[in-house]
């Protein structure tokens, strides 16, 4: 259950960052509202996961999910570059998060 909470927390963190980007684009208050909800829910789920997972593992996986997710959202929806080097390093982050899960 803690891994489900952690994965959901990472996805919500990515959603919060995406809402921050949306707010910078069109300054609507709804983006701030969604940003706050996304980050609050993310921190809550992260804290639940950290009840049983080691802090270092939980935090590394949480930030990894947010980093990879944010980069992929940027590539897929905001026209950010998708060159081979960028994809390689995104894959390294993802592989590291999976590795931490396997040893925890």
Swiss-Prot record:
Annotated GO molecular function terms are: transmembrane transporter activity
| One Gene Ontology cellular component | plasma membrane
Write the record's keywords in alphabetical order, separated by commas: Cell membrane, Ion transport, Membrane, Transmembrane, Transmembrane helix, Transport
UniProt GO BP: monoatomic ion transport
| Compartments, record wording | Cell membrane
Annotated membrane topology is:
Multi-pass membrane protein
**Top-level taxon:** Bacteria
Indicate whether Endoplasmic reticulum appears among the record's keywords.
no
Q: Which residues cross the membrane?
A: 3-23, 31-51, 58-78, 84-104
Q: Does the keyword Transmembrane helix apply?
A: yes
Subunit annotation: The efflux pump is composed of GdnC and GdnD.
What family does the entry list?
Answer: Belongs to the drug/metabolite transporter (DMT) superfamily. Small multidrug resistance (SMR) (TC 2.A.7.1) family. YkkC/YkkD subfamily.
Question: What's this chain's function?
Answer: Probably involved in guanidinium transport.
UniProt protein name: Probable guanidinium efflux system subunit GdnD
Q: What is the protein's species of origin?
A: Bacillus licheniformis (strain ATCC 14580 / DSM 13 / JCM 2505 / CCUG 7422 / NBRC 12200 / NCIMB 9375 / NCTC 10341 / NRRL NRS-1264 / Gibson 46)
| Encoding gene, per UniProt annotation | gdnD
